[in-house]
């Protein structure tokens, strides 16, 4: 079993229409998408012979399927990962693949969004998460 739980928010201060820093984008996708795919590939090379006992869990988010204004990096990265794992599940029927979205969890991420996001609606949503104790 392998759990893919890596995740960073990316730049919350840039609007989607202003995402022009290719190096920043590359670094984000390297961590959140490309490295996950590379690690998963190595995992399968080693353990795929076990057949029915191989389980892959990708920790995803509602943001993978529902756009959230102010979170273009995060939403697009989660969407890319989720679709990668869906394709993998189609191709490798004997491998159990789970895209699991736990919902909002109270972590440092919530505080980071509240303090760093420039989108006020996004801040309000995350203030709501925090006040609900999620």
Describe each PLM feature range.
Residues 96:
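Short, small/polar-rich loop/turn modules that mediate ligand/substrate recognition or access, typified
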Residues 1-3:
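Conserved hydrophobic beta-strands of the Rossmann-like cofactor-binding core
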Residues 5-13:
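Conserved NAD(P)H cofactor-binding loop of Rossmann-fold oxidoreductase domains
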Residues 8-9, 22-24, 48, 53-80, ...:
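Catalytic loop of short-chain dehydrogenase/reductase
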Residues 13-26:
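Substrate-binding pocket helix/loop in short-chain dehydrogenase/reductase
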Residues 99-102, 107, 115-134:
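C-terminal helical subdomain
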Residues 36-43, 47, 84-85:
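Hydrophobic positions on the long internal alpha-helix
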């Amino acid at each position: 079993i392998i759990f893919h739980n890596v995740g960073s928010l990316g730049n919350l201060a840039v609007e989607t229409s202003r995402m022009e820093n290719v190096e920043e984008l590359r670094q984000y996708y390297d961590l959140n998408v490309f490295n996950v795919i590379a690690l998963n590939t190595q995992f399968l090379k080693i353990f795929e012979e076990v057949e029915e006992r191989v389980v892959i869990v990708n920790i995803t988010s509602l943001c993978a399927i529902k756009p959230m204004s102010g979170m273009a990096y995060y939403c697009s990265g989660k969407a890319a990962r989720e679709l990668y794992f869906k394709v993998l599940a189609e191709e490798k029927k004997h491998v159990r693949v789970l895209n699991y979205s736990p919902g909002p969890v109270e972590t440092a991420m919530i505080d980071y969004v509240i303090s760093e996001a420039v989108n006020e609606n996004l801040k309000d949503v995350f203030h709501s998460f925090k006040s609900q104790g999620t």
